[in-house]
């Protein structure tokens, strides 16, 4: 399947999202879980990706006491309020469960990076402000 290039500058603000890179050590070396998105998906259909997705309203509406303060601090983003930081962890756990049936403990997630989809033309007309987490 060929990916179509979006030729327009994207003016919408990026949506907060979370992605999990699941890693495990194996005798033959490091293994990484990638999933193939459904071809009809509106974002990167047919492409291999890490499990993840945008924050749902429920992620913010129901703050969880399961996210330790040390993990919120680990995001190292002074401008990020505690409720949104906790929601990012919850979204990472929820999306991993929804997309591949793996139930992660919040404490197993470690912040790795933050990527924001550019406004310039690219492979999608949607923008995301994604926090990447590693779980091993």
Regions picked out by a protein language model, each given a short descriptive name:
Residues 1-136:
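N-terminal leader/linker segments that precede catalytic domains of diphosphate-processing enzymes
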């Amino acid at each position: 399947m060929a990916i179509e290039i979006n030729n327009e500058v994207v003016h919408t603000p990026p949506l907060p999202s979370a992605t999990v890179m699941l890693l495990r050590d194996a005798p033959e070396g490091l293994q990484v879980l990638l999933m193939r998105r459904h071809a009809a998906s509106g974002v990167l259909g047919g492409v291999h990706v890490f499990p993840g997705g945008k924050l749902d309203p429920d992620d913010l509406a129901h703050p969880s006491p399961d996210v330790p303060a040390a993990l919120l601090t680990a995001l190292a983003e002074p401008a990020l309020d505690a409720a949104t930081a906790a929601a990012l962890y919850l979204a990472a756990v929820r999306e991993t469960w929804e997309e591949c049936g793996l139930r992660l403990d919040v404490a197993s997630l470690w912040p790795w990076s933050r990527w924001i989809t550019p406004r310039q033309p690219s492979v999608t007309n949607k923008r995301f402000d994604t926090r990447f987490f590693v779980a091993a």
